[in-house]
C-alpha cells in the first residue's frame, strides 16, 4: 500500500508511539488466527486482504478477557454481509478460535462498530485503527465512544456513507484524527506531509 493508505511498518511505528505496543500482537493480513490463549488485554490491526495483494482495508481487533469481549472496529462500520460482499472478508473463524482458546466456557461477546466515521474515498483506515487501539488499551471496557480519544469523533449511519450532507462530518473526523496523531505520535509528526498525502480524504478518487 505504498501509493495509498498505510503500510504495516508505519502502523507499527504509530502504535508504538501511542503506547499500545505492550498489548499489540502486530499487523496481520486476512489470515489472522485470532486471540489464542490470551489472558490479558491484547489487540491487532488486520487487513481484509492477503498480504500478497498489498492490502485493501484495515480493521482493528481487540480482546478484553475480563469481560470476555471481542471488539471489531471498522472505520466504515460495514455490516457482516457488506464486509463479505465488498472485501470477501469473514471473521467467524478467528472469532471462534479466539473463543475456544481464550475462555473456559468458549463463549465471547462480540462488540462491533456499526456506524461510519471515515469518508468513502478516504485511505486513512489504518490510522483510524491506531486511534481506536489507543482508546482500547486505555479504556478497554468502553473503547468505541465516551472516552477522550474516540469521543470527539462523530459517527453517521453506514447507509449514509456516500450522502453528500454528511461528508463534512467525516472530513472533520479525519482532521481530528490527524490532530490526535500530531499530538501523540513522533513518527506521524516526522512524516506528516507524506502520510496525509497517502491517506487523504479523497485519495480513492485520485
Curated annotation (Swiss-Prot):
Activity control, per UniProt: Requires DNA and protease cofactor for maximal activation. Inside nascent virions, becomes partially activated by binding to the viral DNA, allowing it to cleave the cofactor that binds to the protease and fully activates it. Actin, like the viral protease cofactor, seems to act as a cofactor in the cleavage of cytokeratin 18 and of actin itself.
Q: GO biological process annotations for this chain's record?
A: proteolysis
The protein's induction, as recorded, is: Expressed in the late phase of the viral replicative cycle.
Q: Name one GO cellular component term.
A: host cell nucleus
Catalytic reaction equation(s):
Cleaves proteins of the adenovirus and its host cell at two consensus sites: -Yaa-Xaa-Gly-Gly-|-Xaa- and -Yaa-Xaa-Gly-Xaa-|-Gly- (in which Yaa is Met, Ile or Leu, and Xaa is any amino acid)
Report the active site residues. Answer: 57, 74, 125
Q: Quote one Gene Ontology molecular function term.
A: cysteine-type endopeptidase activity
Q: What is its EC number?
A: 3.4.22.39
Which key words tag this protein in UniProt?
Autocatalytic cleavage, Disulfide bond, DNA-binding, Host nucleus, Hydrolase, Late protein, Protease, Thiol protease, Virion
- Primary site of residence: virion
Q: Which HAMAP family match?
A: ADV_PRO (MF_04059)
**Subunit note:** Interacts with protease cofactor pVI-C; this interaction is necessary for protease activation.
Q: What is its biological role?
A: Cleaves viral precursor proteins (pTP, pIIIa, pVI, pVII, pVIII, and pX) inside newly assembled particles giving rise to mature virions. Protease complexed to its cofactor slides along the viral DNA to specifically locate and cleave the viral precursors. Mature virions have a weakened organization compared to the unmature virions, thereby facilitating subsequent uncoating. Without maturation, the particle lacks infectivity and is unable to uncoat. Late in adenovirus infection, in the cytoplasm, may participate in the cytoskeleton destruction. Cleaves host cell cytoskeletal keratins K7 and K18.
Name of the protein: Protease
What is the source species? Canine adenovirus serotype 1 (strain CLL)
Cite the source lineage. Viruses, Varidnaviria, Bamfordvirae, Preplasmiviricota, Tectiliviricetes
Amino acid at each position: 500500500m505504498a501509493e495509498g493508505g498505510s503500510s504495516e511498518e508505519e502502523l507499527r511505528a504509530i502504535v508504538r508511539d501511542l503506547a499500545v505496543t505492550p498489548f499489540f500482537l502486530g499487523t496481520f493480513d486476512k489470515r489472522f488466527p485470532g486471540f489464542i490463549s490470551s489472558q490479558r488485554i491484547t489487540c491487532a490491526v488486520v487487513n481484509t486482504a492477503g498480504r500478497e495483494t498489498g492490502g485493501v482495508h484495515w480493521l482493528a481487533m481487540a480482546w478484553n478477557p475480563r469481560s470476555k469481549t471481542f471488539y471489531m472496529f471498522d472505520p466504515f462500520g460495514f455490516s457482516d454481509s457488506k464486509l463479505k460482499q465488498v472485501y470477501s472478508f469473514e471473521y467467524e473463524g478467528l472469532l471462534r478460535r479466539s473463543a475456544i482458546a481464550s475462555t473456559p466456557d468458549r463463549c465471547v461477546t462480540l462488540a462491533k462498530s456499526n456506524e461510519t466515521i471515515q469518508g468513502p474515498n478516504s485511505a486513512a483506515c489504518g490510522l483510524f485503527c491506531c486511534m481506536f487501539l489507543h482508546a482500547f488499551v486505555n479504556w478497554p471496557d468502553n473503547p468505541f465512544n465516551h472516552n477522550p480519544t474516540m469521543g470527539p469523533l462523530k459517527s453517521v449511519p453506514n447507509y449514509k456513507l456516500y450522502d453528500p450532507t454528511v461528508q463534512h462530518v467525516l472530513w472533520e473526523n479525519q482532521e481530528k484524527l490527524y490532530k490526535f496523531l500530531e499530538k501523540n505520535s513522533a513518527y506521524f509528526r516526522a512524516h506528516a506531509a507524506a502520510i496525509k498525502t497517502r491517506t487523504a480524504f479523497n485519495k480513492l478518487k485520485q
